[in-house]
Curated annotation (Swiss-Prot):
It is found in: Cell inner membrane. Keywords: Antibiotic resistance, ATP-binding, Cell inner membrane, Cell membrane, Membrane, Nucleotide-binding, Translocase, Transmembrane, Transmembrane helix, Transport. Homodimer. Part of the tripartite efflux system MacAB-TolC, which is composed of an inner membrane transporter, MacB, a periplasmic membrane fusion protein, MacA, and an outer membrane component, TolC. The complex forms a large protein conduit and can translocate molecules across both the inner and outer membranes. Interacts with MacA. This is Macrolide export ATP-binding/permease protein MacB 1. It is a multi-pass membrane protein. Its main location: membrane. GO terms for cellular component: plasma membrane. It comes from Aeromonas hydrophila subsp. hydrophila (strain ATCC 7966 / DSM 30187 / BCRC 13018 / CCUG 14551 / JCM 1027 / KCTC 2358 / NCIMB 9240 / NCTC 8049).
């Protein structure tokens, strides 16, 4: 007596509700023993394919009990049913249902992939089966390169890769010529003799007669169940089960999903590119905006540093725009000398300025004459190009010595002509040139201005005839906080003046304000750029939904051969993330190209890239792939396998 393997009791299956309810199976009671070869026959609409789908756990009965090897299936989850299909069943379809992008070898190996079999073992087993079925020379052929009979043999090999304890064949010869059909039936007969349980659905009684048991359906009910002379029992085949919990199985599935993602992208190159385009533009915009903001911040901070690091500027009046500031004449050289005596002060320079005509020979230009102390160039960090700077002795002696900048040098002297020792007129005051400094790069005034510097005593006495200063520049020691130094300096000047008739400009405050403003603007523009990235993500979701719709049959095939819900979810999620990652990489490259073009065509804009920004771009593109790819992937994973298989 053979052991019962498949047991159906009171199986009913209906579709629709109410007036539209259609009864397809009506109380099927059936037991199929291990090692039997059963043919299910009947006219179209008799319910034989629906019964086969229930036997293969592709569909669930509306009522009744179905047990596989004693295990009740009605309460099993989708993943548990997938495991049951993978470990017990092998499917042979009338239309083969091979994946067109995969080779014969990879199609056969697909169920073993979901069973967790390692890559080399999976490949070797698939090759052995194909060689056994006469396809050893066509391992790498795609389905489109094979004949119908060869495709059906690939389908048979796929059914056997995990052991094929039960082979379910739905009209296996229906799409074949007579010779190929006879070959397929011969293979199925051989499998039966080897101990496999075969359930064959056909409408051809001549084919059914080759089975040892024939079950006839009519209008959803069994009307006949007759047996022929049984084939001598053979040992049941051993189902080869891999360790599905091993890391190798997960790695194999991830690798295969990655490969399938590349194949899907390559099959639709233009669509993939257009999908990526939104991500490319979004990532390029975000990275470029962040780089521009970072570059602008660095440039502004460099300009502030060019004014002098750790410096305080003291001006008369209550602030910029104070109309009474011109009348305030209390800022004196003595104040500068008092400030120089403070322990936390590094250097001090008085300052006053006026605009006059600079003349040398026939050359006459308008320039700015600055009366400063000997420490001015140290406070402001000017770089000496030629000659020397005036010293304390020159200040004391009211020396008529002048230091000029590069712009003045270019306008007053010929190319290659040395200015040192030459006399120029500052208005009507003759002064001897003793040095040349680099042009102003502070960014708080044009670097095209013409500037010359003379001792402040000379400017006050010989040129302007005044005793008050326009400003005092103070550089504090590096280890001293500017805010604390500002408080001390303000307190000293209030004591000297008896009133708050001055204001202090703290370069550190400017730096902080500009940094904060720049960060805010960068964030604002980056948020605008992120909108384009979100639009790109919506495009990815749209295309992935289209892809799921187009590949519904592929999803059904994967589920039929044992793919779990998580496997399908993983497959489509990897595709979405891969599209976004490649788009992110292209976006970063585009941003770098934009930076090169900016540097080449414009010196006013500097893009400063950072590794953090690039890594953040890849993180954002991956996140977009996960967020916008999850819904299409979940939709694919929740498909009903039989409905997916039946959809063209």
């Amino acid at each position: 007596m053979r052991e019962p393997l498949l047991q159906l009791s009171g199986i009913r299956r209906h579709f629709g509700d109410g007036e539209r309810r259609v009864e397809v199976l009506k109380g099927i009671d059936l037991t199929i023993a291990r090692g039997e070869m059963v043919a299910i026959v009947g006219a179209s609409g008799s319910g034989k394919s629906t019964l086969l789908n229930i036997l293969g756990c592709l569909d669930q009965p509306s009522e009744g009990s179905y047990r596989v090897a004693g295990r009740e299936t009605s309460r099993l989850t989708a993943d548990a049913l997938a495991t049951l299909r993978r470990e017990h069943f092998g499917f042979i379809f009338q239309r083969y249902h091979l994946l067109g992008d995969l080779s014969a070898r990879d199609n056969v190996a697909l169920p073993a992939l979901y069973a967790g079999l390692a890559g080399d073992a999976r490949k070797a087993r698939a090759e052995r089966l194909l060689q056994r079925l006469g396809l050893g020379s066509r391992l790498d052929y795609k389905p489109s390169q094979l004949s119908g009979g060869q495709q059906q043999r690939v389908s048979i090999a796929r059914a056997l890769i995990n052991g094929g304890q039960v082979i379910l064949a739905d009209e296996p010869t229906g799409a074949l010529d007579s010779q190929s059909g006879a070959e397929v039936l011969g293979i199925l007969g051989a499998l039966h003799r080897q101990g496999h349980t075969l359930v064959l659905v056909t409408h051809d009684m001549a084919i059914a007669e080759q089975a040892e048991r024939i079950i006839e359906l009519k209008d959803g009910a069994v009307v006949a169940d007759r047996r022929r002379e049984p084939t001598p029992p053979s040992p049941a085949p051993t189902t080869s089960r891999a360790d599905t919990g091993g890391r190798g199985g997960l790695a194999g599935r991830l690798g295969a999903a990655f490969k399938m993602a590349l194949l899907a992208m390559r099959a639709q190159r233009m669509r993939t590119f257009l999908t990526m385009l939104g991500i490319i533009i979004g990532i390029a915009a975000v990275v470029s905006v962040v780089a521009l903001g970072r570059g602008s911040q660095q440039q502004v901070l460099a300009n502030i540093n060019a004014m002098g690091t750790s410096t305080l500027e003291i001006f008369p009046g209550s602030g910029f725009g104070d109309r009474r500031a011109e009348a305030v004449q209390t800022l004196r050289v003595e104040d500068a000398e008092a400030l120089a005596g403070l322990g936390y002060v590094h250097s001090v320079t008085p300052s006053l300025a006026t605009s006059v005509t600079l003349r040398r020979g026939s050359q006459a230009v308008l320039g700015s004459v600055n009366g400063v102390g000997e420490q001015f160039f140290q406070v402001r960090g000017y770089r000496l190009l030629q000659g020397m700077l005036f010293d304390a002795a020159s200040v004391t002696a009211l020396a008529q010595e002048v230091v000029i900048d590069e712009n003045s040098l270019a306008r007053l002297f010929g190319a290659g002509e040395s200015p040192l020792g030459q006399v120029i007129l500052l208005g009507s005051l003759p002064c001897r040139v003793i040095g040349v400094v680099a042009r102003n790069q502070s960014g708080f005034g044009s670097d095209e201005n013409l500037n010359v510097w003379i001792p402040h005593t000379t400017a006050m006495t010989r040129m302007l005839g005044q005793s008050h200063l326009r400003s005092i520049s103070v550089r504090v020691q590096d280890e001293v906080a500017l805010a604390a130094a500002e408080d001390g300096i303000s307190r000293l000047l209030r004591e000297r003046h008896g009133a708050q008739d001055f204001f202090v400009l703290n370069t550190d405050s400017i730096r902080q304000a500009i940094t904060s403003t720049n960060a805010t603007l960068t964030l604002l523009i980056a948020m605008i750029a992120l909108i384009s990235l979100v639009v790109g993500g919506i495009g990815v979701m749209n295309i992935m939904l289209v892809s799921v719709s187009e590949r519904t049959r592929e999803i059904g095939v994967r589920m039929a051969v044992g793919a779990r819900t998580g496997d399908i979810l993983q497959q489509f999620l990897i595709e979405a993330v891969l599209v976004c990652l490649l788009g992110g990489a292209a976006g970063v490259l585009l941003s770098l190209l934009i930076g090169v073009l900016f540097e080449h065509f414009s010196s006013q804009f500097t893009l400063s890239y950072s590794l953090d920004a690039v890594l953040m771009a890849f993180f954002c593109s991956s996140l977009i792939g996960v967020l916008f790819g999850f819904f299409p992937a979940r939709r694919a994973a929740r498909m009903d396998p039989i409905h997916a298989l039946e959809r063209e």
